[in-house]
Regions:
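Nucleotidyltransferase catalytic core that binds NTPs
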Residues: 1-167
Length: 167
């Protein structure tokens, strides 16, 4: 049976989005016809222990505007995986179509440390897991820490962003 095309799925917190995230999204899009980006929700940001920078709506809206992104989906999961979201997207959108479905990952989840829940769901749904071995470009946590340090005047090497005004 001939497949109609490839649908790619990626997920991320994008809290905040940076150059490394963009390369991850662009690299995934280059390997598929349609790209769906799953945005981890605010509950997941707390579960991860990250510092909230932008809420899920802001992150969703920003990612949704990227040219490489065909569809965005706000995660329905309550843990550190997107397993339920993958299942939902597959069952509601992709199950009845003849697509190869690819789930891409990169960054802090190495090819040997793939989330087990996600891996299991992908196996059940015949979704191919592909690790994109991309160089580490930036870290959202480091960007947030750098901003906090620059605000406190603790960072010599940090230039204050132009939009932060001192009175």
């Amino acid at each position: 049976m001939n497949r109609k095309g490839k649908v790619g799925l990626v997920s991320g917190y994008f809290n905040p989005i940076h150059k490394g995230h963009l390369k991850y999204i662009f690299s995934a899009k280059a390997r598929c016809d349609v790209l769906i980006v799953i945005i981890n929700n605010d509950i997941q940001v707390k579960v991860k222990g990250s510092k909230p920078f932008q809420d899920e709506k802001q992150r969703f809206d920003i990612v949704n505007q990227l040219k490489s992104v065909d569809y965005t989906f706000l995660s329905t999961d309550k843990d550190n995986s997107v397993a339920n979201s993958l299942r939902h997207i597959h069952n509601k959108l992709l199950k009845n179509y003849n697509y190869d479905i690819l789930f891409f990952n990169s960054g802090d989840r190495g090819s040997q440390t793939w989330n087990e829940k996600e891996k299991k769901v992908c196996e059940e749904l015949s979704v191919e897991c592909i690790y994109l071995d991309l160089p580490k470009e930036a870290s959202s946590s480091n960007l947030i820490d750098k901003l906090i340090d620059s605000e406190k005047g603790k960072c010599d090497r940090c230039d204050k962003p132009k939009w932060i005004l001192s009175v």
